[in-house]
Structure formats: structure tokens, C-alpha cells
């Protein structure tokens, strides 16, 4: 753990040389509701249950010093796992549930607006585009790939505030909606992805490197 933190600090310091302000978060997350609907006559749908995983997010903000609103971009990636999934047809739940192994991984990139309030609080709004891969292995094997629209709403409280370095906690909600994609079933059938959503709630720790310091914020 100490080595991981040392690598993160070194990476943040290096990135700060290129950007005015850099943030990194390490989060755990759960997905209380995920839906994956394939474009077929009976609208086959997969709903993974109890998925839990981890994610990293990097935020790069431009301009100096820090202001009430900072504009930048975010890059996020994550991985989660689940053991159970429900299957639906025409909106009706099928009797058999999957108890095999499933996973979901994603990568998202998009613009971001960060709202700084006082010394300790900041809010993040970040729409973006991403790619998502869902895989399920059971009596039926499914691999689904989608391009998604993503909206991330986050809150961070900074409990350590030093000039050029800040540490705090991170919590938020993230919504992903597929725009296009396909699903392969048992290596025999390929369907277009019709609709769906992934709702994610996350929490973790946050690091900030650069000029988001209380003294510079007040000076602005």
C-alpha cells in the first residue's frame, strides 16, 4: 500500500508540470441496477446482480490560480465482478437465474467542471463518452461491447490542505447509457444492443496536486 501511494504521488507531481491542477481518485463502487437489452424480437435482457468493483479517475484542470469553477477533463477506468444475473424476455423475468461468473470493465473520457467551495469542498460534473465490455459465463456465454454516454456527479471533501497537495474523500453517482454496441451469445448469435443503463455509486479517497490550495483560492 505504501508503494502504491508513493507511485501515485510521483505520478501526480509529474503530471502537475504539464497541467495547472491534477486530481486522482481511488474508489470502490457498487451497481444497484444494471440493464443490458439486446435488439431481438423478444427483447432479451440481462441484469447483473450485486456487482462490486474498483475504479481510478484522473482529472486534469486548466488555468491558474484555482477559481470557483475550473474546467478540464477526466479519464476513468474500472472493473467489477458479479456472481448472479437475472434474465428477462419481453419485460418478464425468466425463471432461471445465472449463478456463473460475470465481469464488467470500462474506460471513459470527457470534459469536466469542478466547483470549489471554500477550503474543503468541491463538486464535479463530468459528461463523457466511453467503451464498456460485459462478459458472462454460465449455461449461456455472453460477451457484450458498447459505446456509452456517461454522466459523473461527484463530491469531494478535502481534509488535508497544503500548498500544492491535498487529500480527501470522494463520493458520487455515475450513470452510463449505451449508444451503440453488439452482443455475442454462445459464439453462435450476434445481436445489436438496443438499450440499457448502468447505475453506479462510488466512494473512496482523492488526491490533488497543483494550485488548488486555500490561500490561492481566497486570493482569486
What are the residue ranges of the model-derived segments?
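Hydrophobic h-region of N-terminal signal peptides that target proteins for export
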Residues: 11-18
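Outer-membrane beta-barrel pore domains and translocons
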Residues: 29-35, 74-82, 128-134, 170-178, ...
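Extracytosolic secretory-pathway proteins
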Residues: 146-148, 166-176, 191-197
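Short glycine/proline- and aromatic-enriched beta-strand/turn motifs that initiate or cap beta-hairpins
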Residues: 19-70, 84-87, 181-185, 200-220
Amino acid at each position: 500500500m505504501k508503494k502504491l501511494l508513493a507511485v501515485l504521488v510521483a505520478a501526480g507531481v509529474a503530471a502537475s508540470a504539464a497541467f495547472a491542477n491534477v486530481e486522482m481518485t481511488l474508489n470502490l463502487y457498487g451497481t444497484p441496477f444494471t440493464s443490458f437489452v439486446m435488439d431481438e424480437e423478444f427483447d432479451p435482457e440481462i441484469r447483473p446482480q450485486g456487482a462490486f468493483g474498483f475504479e481510478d479517475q484522473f482529472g486534469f484542470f486548466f488555468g491558474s490560480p484555482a477559481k470557483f469553477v475550473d474546467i478540464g477533463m477526466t479519464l476513468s477506468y474500472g472493473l467489477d465482478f458479479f456472481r448472479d444475473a437475472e434474465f428477462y424476455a419481453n419485460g418478464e423475468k425468466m425463471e432461471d437465474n445465472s449463478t456463473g461468473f460475470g465481469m464488467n470493465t470500462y474506460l471513459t473520457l470527457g470534459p469536466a467542471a469542478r466547483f470549489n467551495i471554500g477550503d474543503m469542498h468541491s463538486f464535479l460534473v463530468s459528461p463523457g463518452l466511453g467503451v464498456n465490455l460485459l462478459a458472462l459465463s454460465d449455461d449461456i456465454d455472453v460477451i457484450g461491447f458498447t459505446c456509452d454516454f456517461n454522466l459523473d456527479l461527484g463530491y469531494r471533501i478535502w481534509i488535508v490542505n497544503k500548498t500544492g497537495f491535498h487529500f480527501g474523500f470522494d463520493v458520487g453517482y455515475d450513470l452510463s447509457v449505451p449508444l451503440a454496441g453488439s452482443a455475442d451469445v454462445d459464439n453462435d448469435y450476434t445481436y445489436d444492443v438496443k438499450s440499457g443503463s448502468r447505475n453506479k455509486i462510488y466512494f473512496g479517497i482523492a488526491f490533488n496536486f497543483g494550485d488548488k490550495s486555500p490561500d490561492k483560492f481566497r486570493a482569486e
